[in-house]
A protein has these predicted regions:
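Extended catalytic cores of very large enzyme megasubunits
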Residues: 2-184
Length: 184
């Protein structure tokens, strides 16, 4: 592509393209450096790619996260411990000058939750929002007034209001508190 641009006299465009490609290669290398330390790094790479898109500022470069993360690594660490260390590294990079590391830490923390939740729901054979609410009411974790006040259709409709994209608005401290104290 660069050669064609150069031959046609588009020197500025060629330079821009070369710089763009070089930057993309550098960013990919940063992601791969972190993901190479995990057995299943594909899902994590998608998260880190989105982090690079959403937080393009220099203070949020993944090389900083990689360096901090590697300082926590120990040879005997399993996948779960490594993910916890990566989350901790992102959380510890949070400063007044770089407050968005807390959102990045939350995204990493949230990495395993959907799969864990799906497994738990499959084990309990809960497939609709109504079934989830019914299960929690039966165990006394939700008030029975919910089932008395709403129909199955209304509860299933309420379940459609949940938008996983909003998970990215949670900070690490908020998500950690939510998962530890309130997720049933």
């Amino acid at each position: 592509v660069e050669e064609t641009l150069m031959l046609k006299g588009y020197f500025a465009q060629s330079k821009s393209y070369i710089l763009y490609r070089s930057e993309r290669t550098r960013m990919r290398a940063q992601r791969k450096s972190i993901c190479s330390l995990f057995a299943e790094g594909d899902a994590l790479e998608k998260i880190l790619d989105k982090v690079q898109t959403d937080f393009p500022e220099e203070m949020y470069e993944l090389s900083r996260l990689d360096e901090k993360f590697r300082s926590f690594l120990k040879p005997e660490m399993g996948e779960s411990a490594k993910r916890a260390a990566l989350t901790r590294a992102a959380a510890e990079l949070t400063t007044q000058e770089a407050p968005h590391w807390e959102f990045i830490a939350a995204r990493i923390l949230m990495h395993d939750f959907p799969a864990d939740l799906s497994r738990a729901l499959d084990e309990l054979q809960l497939h609709s929002y109504f079934e989830k609410v019914s299960y929690l009411c039966e165990r006394g974790l939700y008030g029975s007034y919910i089932l008395e006040s709403y129909t199955k259709e209304e509860l299933d409709e309420a379940g459609t209001f949940i938008n996983p994209a909003h998970d990215e608005k949670l900070t690490y401290s908020g998500l950690e508190l939510l998962l530890r104290r309130y997720v049933i």
